[in-house]
Amino acid sequence: MERSKVMILRAKIPATAFLPLFTFALAMWLAGCGGATTASTPSPSPTPTPTPTPTDPDQRADSLIAQMTQQEMLQLVHGDLPFTSPVGPRNTSGWVPGLPGLEIPDLLYADGPAGVGDQVGPATALPSTLASAASWDLTEAYKYGQVIGLEESAFGINVYLGGNVNLTGREPRDGRTFETTGEDPFLAGEINAQHLLGVQDQNVIAGVKHYAFNDQETGRLLANALIDERSARESDLLAFEVSLKGSNAQMVMCAGNLVNGTYNCQNNHLLNDVLKGSMGFDGFVLSDWYSTESSVPSALGGLDQEQPYGYYFDGIWEYEQSNGTWAAESLEQALANGDMPVSRLDNMVHRVLRGMCVAGVMDTPVDVHPINAAADAAIAQEAEEQGAVLLKNAGGQLPLNPSAAQSIAVIGSHADVGVLSGGGSAQVTPYGGSALTLPPDCPPNSSFPGGAACTWSSQIYDPSPPLAAIKAIAPKATVTYDDGTDPDAAAALAATSTVAIVFESDWESEGMDRVDLSFPSAQDALVAAVAAANPHTVVVLENGGAHVMPWLANVSAVLEAWYPGQKGGTAIANLLFGAVNPSGKLPITFPASVSQLPRPVIPIPTSTTEAFNVDYTIEGFNVGYKWYEAQNLQPLFAFGYGLSYTTFSITNPQVTPDSPPSNGFQVSFNVTNTGNQAGAEVAQVYLGLPSGIGEPPMRLVGWSKVLLQPGAQQAVTVTVDATSSSHPLSYWSTSTNGWVVAPGDYTVYVGNSSDNVKPAGTFHVG
């Protein structure tokens, strides 16, 4: 399903009223990528006519390279420590010095999956990226990315290190699940593409990470992902392809792990054959921090720019522990020795410069100014309201009546001060300051070798307390808070209350994986005690990914709020009291137990230096819901699942194949709001490929989110194009080394979750 880019929703803030805090060297005099020419200075004597700046990004990059010395070229292919930057914020992730003589600006990098990261400055803390994916709304996803791009630009940042599209279904305990866009390559890729478009439209280079199969934090720099070619192409690599082709993002970050025995950042097959070859990526590949292992093999393997803590390209830190010698040669030495052709350096620099031009970095003067905090916070609230998922609502417990004179117990998870956020490089310093900062809660597996320490991050609560928001939206209610540390006291309060709202949370972060799928710190026992005291118990979850819920049968309602962001408390109150009708759908599967996972125990390293295998051939391309379907397992909550305060029906499906059918099809159906409240339904289209080729039972190929008033009906048509970047009708053939549409019968399914679909029709490819 191809979708056009949505319109820019808010213009970039003008800076005429603000003094710039720093500038990129001479950037304001750069000529435009779109065809502007450099003006000549009048002279009393004849002067040559200036050469027009090429309008094509590739031609412009080549023109600059022709004017560069080898040292200048080498300067653009390795980054430096952020605190060595003479310009810009000190707390960036890193920087690459520009070349003022050629009017090439510095590159300043910052993380930002859920807002401007790296403590660059107080920024809007958006809901988690996974919450954005749960909206299943491309317009909302674009607005989400737009906030990040606008704010990174406001801080003088011009390279975005977000865009995490690793598929979470392989390892639901991954500490970075909250940074991702889900388990399905099509949904994850489409949502991520809109994030990237929103960023790059603000003249910030957008990046996709972590390429590839970087699906666990435990021993992440030593993990060797084992995967066959067909499974790789139809799962994780497909998510990257959809993201890149849907966004024109100009940077890909290679990860620190190995794939089939070769480190990602020197993996010729993944970088040159797949990414730059069959996917047609023409931007630059940048290493994750600590993720290079060589100089020449990395450069020849497809790495274009090395970032700090590697220092192989410039020959500074290539210390070989085995014999105590400085072993690896720098790129400068390799060029002199003939170990690397000059043409490869030319290509590396070309890709960096091309990316700068395409994204508008080359022609955008630094414009440092305050962020538009109020407008961006409103988008953060909207993103949470669209992405929260109603998991249970027995007896219509929700929405609560905001006008009732009732007693409400609010219990647990510091709901009196704020809402929890995720940690690591994705951590945002929230605008207005942290409401509460606690030490990191690192599980035992975070201390394994070959990983990143989780101790450098803290538990930060964004300043939007649900308690205050509940009091504001229900002024006639008596609202009482209990911190939940004593289950008996919490149960006693619940027993005397009309309704009990328990907040249950789990801090997740880069540098660690969860040891299981349970909530920590006896919170499950707290919920059980409260539910035993009051049958009208509502649970609100603040967490990064899937969890088990042993108390589920005994509570009346469950709202998955994810990490809800800067305005999370207000959004949660609006959802609980019906000011907003929940419409989110799960972008991941919630397992019933760890025993259902392909690897019930997370693989761990046994050495500080030796790689260890993580066997992804177990599930292959059957990631997430495809695994549960293939294994006939019933999860706790299925992919695509989510309730509403109203009800819907999907009727009268009709499938119309293209001519020939191998080109794709259209499926039409009616969506009706059969309840008494306005609400939105996400109608999902899945496709089953012909039997006998070994594909999953079905795959997501399209969807439509429809907002309807009570009793209203809308005719919907979803078009599935076989030539789109998700290859919806194809499988990867290892014999032809390409995508193939197999002959046979194709079955189209329509429904509102992966476990609630019905056949809509079939068509035959002859």
Residue spans of the language-model regions?
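Short beta-strand elements
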Residues: 756-766
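C-terminal motif of bacterial Sec signal peptides marking the signal peptidase cleavage site
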Residues: 30-32
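Glycoside hydrolase catalytic-domain context in secreted enzymes
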Residues: 40-734, 738-740, 745-754
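N-terminal secretory signal peptides that target proteins for export/translocation
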Residues: 1-16
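Bacterial signal peptide processing site
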Residues: 34-36
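Sec-dependent N-terminal signal peptides
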Residues: 14-25
